[in-house]
Amino acid sequence: VIGGDECNINEHRSL
């Protein structure tokens, strides 16, 4: 996927 950092932030936001 593009924007690995964004994906990480999204997961953190979910938590």
UniProtKB/Swiss-Prot annotation:
The keyword Protease applies. Its EC number is 3.4.21.-. One of its GO terms (biological process) is proteolysis. Keywords: Disulfide bond, Fibrinogenolytic toxin, Hemostasis impairing toxin, Hydrolase, Protease, Secreted, Serine protease, Toxin. Inhibited by PMSF, bovine aprotinin (APR), soybean trypsin inhibitor (STI), and high temperature (85 degrees Celsius). Is not inhibited by EDTA, and beta-mercaptoethanol. Expressed by the venom gland. GO terms for molecular function: serine-type endopeptidase activity; toxin activity. It is found in: Secreted. GO terms for cellular component: extracellular space. The keyword Disulfide bond applies. Snake venom serine protease that cleaves fibrinogen Aalpha chain (FGA), partially cleaves Bbeta chain (FGB) and has no activity on gamma chain. Is less potent than A1 and A2 alpha-fibrinogenases. Belongs to the peptidase S1 family. Snake venom subfamily. Monomer. This is Alpha-fibrinogenase A3. It comes from Crotalus atrox (Western diamondback rattlesnake). The lineage of its organism: Eukaryota, Metazoa, Chordata, Craniata, Vertebrata.
